């Protein structure tokens, strides 16, 4: 986002010219106005709630930041101890499309002796029309148990993406809906997602719904495969029923909740959704540490072994720079583990075109050179972030797909990956 100032006068129209050149698969432009404040207003504190009959405010004091965070966790819950492997390098992309993809890429890390702990399965491992089934599509993942066994035999870990979203034709939707635990506005308005199917999200504020949601996950992804899933990626946990929607309609799509109106409880969806998975996994396998990665967070989420990443950021230098501020602010808020889509998620068209040209000609043009340096610099930054996780859309994000082995970008990425592991004991 970019900030600029334009002098305006009361009652006088002021022309504003905005030049916008979208570069990427999906691009959005919005304009927000920050009205200037008077000197008197600058020295005042105003706290308000859009919709709440009562509100408690807490002031947590301390002699230093550690004491403040300790007080925050006394109030909201202690941070759970994550599995040690979560501190290592994670390889992800949008997306691995088969069990063969998963196994071959992990094996290549091992063959090249490049450290990695976690390989991540993003969305759409299910049949195209079966979002919410939590089932691997047999044509692309014929033997999920064998895939998981192979990952573990290579001393890897497997994380999988699960959304609180269901197409209205799948069995899991119908089971939850029969109890009255689905949000219906999206169905009523006949909203179809970018793949052309209709669905909605479940009401995670209902304890019964949470238990059923976990049971469906467990039956299809966890107990079914001998607890072979090591971690859960809980995506779209705002909940993001529909992309790029005005706030008033977002609230309509995600309510009413079991506790009350969505306006009153809007920001807390991710923590009740995390509650479902944390307590669900502990109930069936108490000897395995839980780990969740979620796109949105709420106060106290650390007690559910949950980390948060900063969402679908763009592959731009300014976006990488913004992550430095975001990560510091997040960590000071009392939640210990934070991460980002290292390398940027949404890719500018010029980088895509540059990679396509290289694939055809073997020539590195200026845009590809910049792409490779950006990936290398972002990996250097990521080495010192709590969660060291590469992820994004095409071009592919494995180091050998970013640059050849004799390229400075390749050498830099591998060097910082190994540095991460040397620093891990500290």
Residue ranges of predicted features:
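Catalytic-domain carbohydrate-binding cleft regions of carbohydrate-active enzymes
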Residues: 1-14, 23-28, 34-426
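Beta-strand-rich extracellular modules
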Residues: 19-21
């Amino acid at each position: 986002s970019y900030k600029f100032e334009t002098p305006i006068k009361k009652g006088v129209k002021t022309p504003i010219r905005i030049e916008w050149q979208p570069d990427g698969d999906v691009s959005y432009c919005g304009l927000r106005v920050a009205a200037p404040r008077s000197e008197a207003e600058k020295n005042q504190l105003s706290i308000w709630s859009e919709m709440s009959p009562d509100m408690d405010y807490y002031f947590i004091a301390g002699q230093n930041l550690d004491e403040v965070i300790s007080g925050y966790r006394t109030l909201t819950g202690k941070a759970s101890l994550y599995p040690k492997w979560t501190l290592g390098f994670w390889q992800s992309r949008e997306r691995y499309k088969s069990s063969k993809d998963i196994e071959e890429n992990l094996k290549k890390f091992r063959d090249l002796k490049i450290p990695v702990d976690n390989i991540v399965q993003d969305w759409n491992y299910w049949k195209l029309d079966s979002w919410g089934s939590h089932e691997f599509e047999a044509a692309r993942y014929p033997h999920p148990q064998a895939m998981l066994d192979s990952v573990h035999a290579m001393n890897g870990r497997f994380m999988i993406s699960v959304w609180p979203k269901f197409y209205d034709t799948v069995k899991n939707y119908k089971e939850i809906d029969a109890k009255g635990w689905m949000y219906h506005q999206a169905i009523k308005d006949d909203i179809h997602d970018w793949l052309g199917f209709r669905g909605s999200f479940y009401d995670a504020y209902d304890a019964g719904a949470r238990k059923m949601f976990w049971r469906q996950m467990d039956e299809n992804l966890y107990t079914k495969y001998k607890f072979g899933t090591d971690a859960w990626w809980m995506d779209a946990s705002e909940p993001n029923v529909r992309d790029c929607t005005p706030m008033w309609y977002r609230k309509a799509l995600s309510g009413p909740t079991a506790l009350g109106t969505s306006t009153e409880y809007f920001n807390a969806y991710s923590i009740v959704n995390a509650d479902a998975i944390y307590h669900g996994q502990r109930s069936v396998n108490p000897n395995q540490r839980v780990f969740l990665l979620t796109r949105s967070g709420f106060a106290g989420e650390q007690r559910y072994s949950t980390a948060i990443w900063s969402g679908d950021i763009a592959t731009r230098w300014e976006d990488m720079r913004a992550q430095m501020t975001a990560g510091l602010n997040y960590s000071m808020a009392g939640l210990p583990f934070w991460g980002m889509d290292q390398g940027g998620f949404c890719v500018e068209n010029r980088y895509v075109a540059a990679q396509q040209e290289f694939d055809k000609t073997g020539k590195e043009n200026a845009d590809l050179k910049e792409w490779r340096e950006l990936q290398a610099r972002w990996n250097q930054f990521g080495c010192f972030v709590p969660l060291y996780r590469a992820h994004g859309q095409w071009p592919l994000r494995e180091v050998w797909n970013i640059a050849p082995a004799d390229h400075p970008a390749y050498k830099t990425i591998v060097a910082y990956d190994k540095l991460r592991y040397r620093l891990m004991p500290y």
